[in-house]
A protein has these predicted regions:
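Catalytic phosphate/metal-binding cores of nucleic-acid and nucleotide-processing enzymes, i.e., regions
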Residues: 1-120
């Protein structure tokens, strides 16, 4: 989580930190400080086909629903690039209300965040 917080700061200039409430209550992401997003971070040594586990996505969407924010699952397996999972509607609003997801690179997710700032 600290490594990811540094990556977010380096790319977006936003200071995020671990959400200690995640250990006391359900429906909390791993990092807080990036308005509009619930961030769940996962890192594992071995992958299962290089994809994310459905329970990881369920965890972050539950937390995002509780706070009315966009969920992002950011995961990394050893010797693999960081990947991000978002609702397709985060990329294209025409998919709003659907459960379709997209797996994108970390720089692409940062671009989505920056574009969201431009829309405000």
């Amino acid at each position: 989580e600290r490594e990811l917080a540094k990556m977010i700061y380096d790319e977006l200039g936003v200071q995020t930190k671990r959400d200690l409430e995640q250990y006391r209550a359900s429906d909390h992401g791993d990092l807080i400080g990036l308005d509009g997003w619930t961030i769940e971070a996962k890192r594992y040594a071995h992958n299962a086909g290089g994809n994310f586990k459905p329970e990881w996505w369920a965890q972050v969407t539950s937390a995002a629903n509780a706070t009315a924010t966009e969920p992002v699952l950011i995961f990394k397996y050893d010797r693999q690039p960081v990947k991000c999972v978002v609702f397709l509607s985060s990329i294209n609003g025409e998919f709003a209300g659907k459960d379709n997801v997209a797996t994108i690179s970390f720089p692409t997710w940062c671009m989505l965040v920056r574009e969201g700032w431009a829309d405000v």
